[in-house]
Amino acid sequence: MMVAVTGGPCGGKTTALVELAEELPKLGVAVMRCPELSTLLFGAGAAFPGLGTRAEQLAWDYHKLRAQLALEDTLCSIAAESAQPTMVLMDRGALDSKAFVATGDEAGQHAWEQLLERGGWDEASLLSRYDAVIHLVTTAIGAEEHYSGATSNAARREDVAEAQAQDLRIRTAWQSHPKFCLVSNEHVSSFDEKLRHATTFLYQQEHFLDMITTQSDQTIER
């Protein structure tokens, strides 16, 4: 089972991934975590060429997405051959790239279409790679008092308005996924409660329930 965990800046994505990686093994489900590719490239000295030409920027986005898909495929292949039910947790997924390339204007949409054409990809196929998508809304929407532009991710830094706009682009890119869960900051009194909304959604998914059943059957057989 592959799940994309995404969202806006300071939405709680990193904390949610850590929490899931700790809790799922208690249910008999092994966890593999795919790091956010932007952060991985940043750490490798291949940061986004913000001052480069548009062609250089688009090339970076293309190679980042290609690397992400390859890493996802590798982890899923390893998980498929494991005797233990395994969940692959993605720190962002393929459609996050759309949010950062197609930034709302015609030029951005054209750039995204160029990127898809170069890779031989289409949005429907990219979406279908994931069994579920969890979007944790930035605290810049609905919990502004908790928002800090100095996020845990050194690769990016956004003010409130930028974080709000980015969050909306990301959720728009993903929202047509049939198993899309939007976890907002409304009607929650704490981040723990926000996280419970995300985990409850995940634990109700048919694919997850099948994994738990498989693990139980294997335990009985032993």
Q: What are these model-derived regions, one by one?
A:
Residues 16:
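Hydrophobic positions on the alpha1 helix immediately C-terminal to the Walker A/P-loop
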Residues 21-67:
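Conserved substrate/cofactor phosphate-moiety recognition/catalytic segment
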Residues 5:
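Hydrophobic anchor at the beta1->P-loop junction of P-loop NTPases
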Residues 100, 104-172, 185-189:
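A glycine- and Lys/Arg-enriched "phosphate-lid" helix/loop adjacent to the NTP-binding pocket
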Residues 152-155, 162-222:
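NTP-dependent small-molecule kinase module
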Residues 9:
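The conserved Walker
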Residues 60-127:
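Glycine-rich phosphate-binding loop used to anchor ATP phosphates in small-molecule kinases
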Residues 13:
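Conserved lysine of the Walker
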